């Protein structure tokens, strides 16, 4: 059970590309545009100390907390799964604490990107708690950021009885000049060792699916020691955590 955040995000972007009033040129963003993904857990935690407004999004199976600084998902609770046998608390998958970081980041990079190592977009939103209402099948929550005559909307979409988290970007360019941006997404996770026992070992690490290889696991040590960057026309990236895939 993996919250297919990045998969669904990319599907949405392919299906519904951002709308702009000015024609934009395609560009390949340098990797330095992407907010840093540190190999040190201490650095990762330090990187997340500055926060914006924390808002809550909830449907019937999932509760999310989103930081308006960047619009990152910093917490997810699986409401139909107990934290442990006999517990009344839901299982927490994504979290952002001093001891453990596992968050889903996404944004816009490139020449005119609003998410860089120098800073993230500070979105505005009306309200702080959004819940799927009785009889409602879809919850849509827009976050808005304006800069230099351009309005950016990052829209989260939750559907009833679904763990998918839709993330759409809408851009209204009234600046009079073309802009160059492209979407990025990444999962940020504290480095951990696999645990469990001999009879039932558990695994925490990464997994790729690409047009060349349907499924391949990568440990955190692989990520630390190797360049795992690949080019593919289709695929997904996931973090496997214990028995949740």
Task: Label the predicted regions.
Residues 1-34:
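Subset of Sec-pathway N-terminal targeting signals
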Residues 54, 58-245:
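Soluble non-transmembrane domains of integral membrane proteins
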Residues 4-11, 15, 45-50, 57, ...:
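Generic low-polarity alpha-helical segments
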Residues 29-55:
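Short, Gly/Pro- and small/polar-rich lid/capping loops
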């Amino acid at each position: 059970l993996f919250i297919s955040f990045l998969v669904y995000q990319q599907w949405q972007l392919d299906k519904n590309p951002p709308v702009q009033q000015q024609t934009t040129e395609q560009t390949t963003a340098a990797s330095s545009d992407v907010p840093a993904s540190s190999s040190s857990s201490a650095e990762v935690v330090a990187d997340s100390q500055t926060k914006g407004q924390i808002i809550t999004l909830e449907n019937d199976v999932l509760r999310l907390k989103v930081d308006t600084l960047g619009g990152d998902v910093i917490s997810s609770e699986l409401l139909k799964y107990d934290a442990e046998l006999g517990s009344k608390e839901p299982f927490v998958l994504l979290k952002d604490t001093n001891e453990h970081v596992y968050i889903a980041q996404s944004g816009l990079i490139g020449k005119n990107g609003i998410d860089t190592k120098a800073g993230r977009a500070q979105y505005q939103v009306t309200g702080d708690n959004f819940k799927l209402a009785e009889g409602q099948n879809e919850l849509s929550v827009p976050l808005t950021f304006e800069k230099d005559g351009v309005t950016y909307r990052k829209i989260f979409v939750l559907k009833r009885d679904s763990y998918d988290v839709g993330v759409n970007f809408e851009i209204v360019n009234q600046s009079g000049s073309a802009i160059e941006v492209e979407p990025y997404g990444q999962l940020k996770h504290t480095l951990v060792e696999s645990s469990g026992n001999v009879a039932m070992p558990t695994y925490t690490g990464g997994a790729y699916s690409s047009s060349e290889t349907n499924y391949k696991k990568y440990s955190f040590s692989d990520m630390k020691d190797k360049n795992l960057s690949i080019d593919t026309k289709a695929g997904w990236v996931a973090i496997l955590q214990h028995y949740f895939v």
